[in-house]
């Protein structure tokens, strides 16, 4: 997570360097891509971490993709240990985590273009069908903070 955090935090400097080497539009597109990819990297890292921790705790191996579904992953831990994700995150953090995971899904599988299924699944009122998800630096950093907090909590489970 530290590498992803440093990358996200240094995007302005990278954009300046890339602008010197290429042009402003190319630099902007490259930095936007890195920022969008950070969502995927964080979610993928969390999925694998949660799968491994769950197996360590329960002896049961679940599909790694089960842990990109926030409620499902939380339920696995709750059923096994009595503590779901809500034991470690506030309700607001859980809501944001679910939203970020949904945004990552639409970025990965629909090139960031919002469809009705995304709106129905996420409840995201910031976008309409046909618009493109825009990842903000503060959102990427927020997702990292939430995942670090949740991962620390999961590490306390036995």
Segment roles from a protein language model:
Residues 1-122, 129-158:
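Amphipathic alpha-helical interface elements
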């Amino acid at each position: 997570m530290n590498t992803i955090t440093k990358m996200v935090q240094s995007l302005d400097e990278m954009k300046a360097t890339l602008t010197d080497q290429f042009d402003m539009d190319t630099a902007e597109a490259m930095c936007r891509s890195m920022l969008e990819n950070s969502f995927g990297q964080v979610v993928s890292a969390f999925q694998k971490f949660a799968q491994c921790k769950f197996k360590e705790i329960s002896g049961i191996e679940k599909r790694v993709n089960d842990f990109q579904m926030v409620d499902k992953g939380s339920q696995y831990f709750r059923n096994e240990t009595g503590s779901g994700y809500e034991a470690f995150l506030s309700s607001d953090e859980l809501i944001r985590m679910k939203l970020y995971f949904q945004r990552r899904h639409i970025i990965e599988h629909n090139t960031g273009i919002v469809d009705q299924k995304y709106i129905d699944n996420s409840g995201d009122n910031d976008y309409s069908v046909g618009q493109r998800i825009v990842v903000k630096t503060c959102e990427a950093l927020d997702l990292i903070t939430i995942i670090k907090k949740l991962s620390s909590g999961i590490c306390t489970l036995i």
